[in-house]
């Protein structure tokens, strides 16, 4: 790619239906890249496993190759607005430097922005993946459906991320590390976290946490289902525990109940501080909503005065319906972070087509 059209140049024709952006969703498990048009949505996308064994530079090489392929495919028909990248945090901005990311071992201090820009030969836009998921959910998902201007989001995947939109603007904090909801304390002296602390929400409500808690429960109870799972697949994952829960395993269901309790404790602090009308839970683990949400809501009622007063389902509430507290699964599903990365690279005045699939 010899030269890229900048967002400022594209903004001169901001209603141009031929504008497109390329978004990157860099995760600890998967690397996804998409070309996006404001008038047509996702034009094309590609996904691959994140090869952590190749190191940060190796992952960036794969990322850049996928980005260039999509640019070459669509640049003859569309004007490129820019490239947006979402990455696990903590992410220091504006430097684009990653600090001790729990889900990207060996990446501490890696200059992600600089490495990508050197390889592509152009500036990029970069933000934490959870912030971008929140922004997409605000622009294209529940934020648009409910016509609200603020929301808080937790992403439940390999780890637990957080994002915050206030008064229509993505709020990233003083240096990009705002809304690190995965590191809210839920259990004093709890499980050690990759951030260096103990008892963080991420250690009880992420995919890695579900697998760990299932192993701990196996030692406690010797559950037949969990025992058979361990025998057939010693390195079982959260997906395996989820499948077992769907098959009726009481102990597998107990793992998700414990996850819900931890989420309720963490959300209680967030709700008490922010007092927003919408909190969104996204990421792969949301498929287990019915397994963890009842315990989550019960814990919230116990621990959050604000939630008890403003809960959407509270009978005889004096709070107007539009201002009541909703906690809902994300509307955009696993595409939220990728869509957010695409939106990040567009001129902010550019209108976008609502997500419709």
For each of these PLM feature ranges, what is it?
Residues 142, 146-207:
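Glycine-rich phosphate-binding loop of actin/hexokinase-like ATP-binding domains
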Residues 96-107:
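A charged helix-plus-loop insertion that forms the helical arch/lid used to bind
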Residues 117-138, 152-154:
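ATP-dependent carbohydrate kinase catalytic cores
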Residues 1-82, 92-97, 114-122, 139-147, ...:
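ATP-binding/phosphotransfer module of carbohydrate and carboxylate kinases, centering on a glycine-rich
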Residues 25, 84-88, 127, 152-159, ...:
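Short beta-strand segments
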Residues 49-51, 106-107, 178-180:
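A short acidic/small-residue loop/turn micro-motif
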């Amino acid at each position: 790619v010899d030269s890229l059209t900048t967002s400022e140049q594209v903004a001169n024709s901001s209603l141009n239906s031929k504008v497109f952006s390329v978004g990157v969703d860099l995760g600890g498990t998967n690397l996804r890249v998409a070309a996006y048009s404001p008038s047509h949505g996702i034009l094309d996308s590609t996904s691959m496993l994140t090869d952590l064994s190749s190191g940060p530079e190796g992952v960036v090489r794969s990322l850049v190759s996928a980005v260039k392929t999509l640019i070459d495919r669509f640049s003859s028909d569309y004007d490129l607005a820019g490239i947006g990248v979402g990455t696990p945090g903590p992410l220091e901005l504006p430097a684009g430097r990653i600090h001790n990311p729990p889900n990207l071992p060996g990446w501490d201090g890696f200059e992600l922005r600089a490495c990508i820009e050197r390889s592509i030969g152009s500036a990029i836009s970069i933000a934490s993946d959870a912030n971008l998921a929140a922004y997409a959910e605000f622009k294209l998902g529940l934020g648009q459906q409910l016509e609200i201007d603020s929301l808080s989001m937790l992403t439940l995947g390999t780890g637990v991320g957080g994002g915050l939109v206030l008064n229509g603007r993505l709020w990233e904090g003083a240096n990009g590390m705002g809304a690190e909801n995965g590191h809210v304390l839920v259990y004093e002296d709890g499980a050690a976290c990759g951030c260096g602390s103990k008892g963080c929400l991420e250690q009880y409500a992420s995919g890695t946490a579900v697998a760990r808690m299932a192993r701990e429960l196996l030692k406690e109870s010797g559950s037949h289902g969990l025992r058979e799972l361990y025998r057939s697949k010693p390195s079982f994952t959260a997906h395996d525990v989820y499948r077992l829960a769907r098959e009726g395993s009481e102990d597998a269901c107990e793992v998700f109940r414990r996850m819900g309790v931890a989420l309720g404790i963490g959300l209680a602090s967030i709700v008490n501080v922010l007092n927003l009308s919408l909190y969104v839970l996204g990421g792969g683990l949301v498929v287990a909503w019915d397994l963890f949400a009842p315990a989550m809501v019960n814990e919230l009622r116990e621990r959050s005065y604000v939630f008890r007063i403003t809960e959407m389902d509270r009978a005889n509430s004096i709070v107007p319906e539009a201002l009541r507290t909703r906690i809902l699964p994300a509307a955009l599903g696993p595409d939220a972070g990728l869509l957010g990365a695409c939106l990040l690279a567009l001129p902010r005045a550019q209108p976008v087509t609502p997500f419709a699939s």
